[in-house]
């Protein structure tokens, strides 16, 4: 689109508009019908062609065939449930595990009240929110990686 929308600076009408101080909104082609009827379908069809081409040239396998007589030793949830699964697996009391999971959104709801978020948009000028984000990300990654390991190595990730 950058090539098709490039203004012709040799055009005397455009030069006159620019000399009067009229900005970039006063030149170029209108979005309707040019973009919506000509450029966007080309982009959409090109994207679909790339996806179909990749699917034909490099098909991904669906997975292992299901065998009802061979149960895996440990059934793991989907990857986005790994931290929650790890909490429930390591905490001995299930009620405590559920309370730990509920405390995460409750703690995140208190962050705006701990500091004035509307005052600054720079994350370095909001140390509480930045610290909560960094520690939460590190804990989620730690728990997620630990969920894929055996229970005896899950909390230390086999490092200690």
Swiss-Prot record:
GO terms for biological process: photosynthetic electron transport chain. GO terms for cellular component: chloroplast thylakoid membrane. The chain crosses the membrane at residues 36-56, 95-115, 131-151. It is found in: Plastid, Chloroplast thylakoid membrane. It is a multi-pass membrane protein. Keywords: Chloroplast, Electron transport, Membrane, Photosynthesis, Plastid, Thylakoid, Transmembrane, Transmembrane helix, Transport. Its main location: plastid. Coiled coil: none annotated. GO terms for molecular function: electron transporter, transferring electrons within cytochrome b6/f complex of photosystem II activity; electron transporter, transferring electrons within the cyclic electron transport pathway of photosynthesis activity; oxidoreductase activity. It holds the Pfam family Cytochrom_B_C. SUPFAM superfamilies: a domain/subunit of cytochrome bc1 complex (Ubiquinol-cytochrome c reductase) (SSF81648). The 4 large subunits of the cytochrome b6-f complex are cytochrome b6, subunit IV (17 kDa polypeptide, petD), cytochrome f and the Rieske protein, while the 4 small subunits are petG, petL, petM and petN. The complex functions as a dimer. Component of the cytochrome b6-f complex, which mediates electron transfer between photosystem II (PSII) and photosystem I (PSI), cyclic electron flow around PSI, and state transitions. Belongs to the cytochrome b family. PetD subfamily. This is Cytochrome b6-f complex subunit 4. The gene is petD.
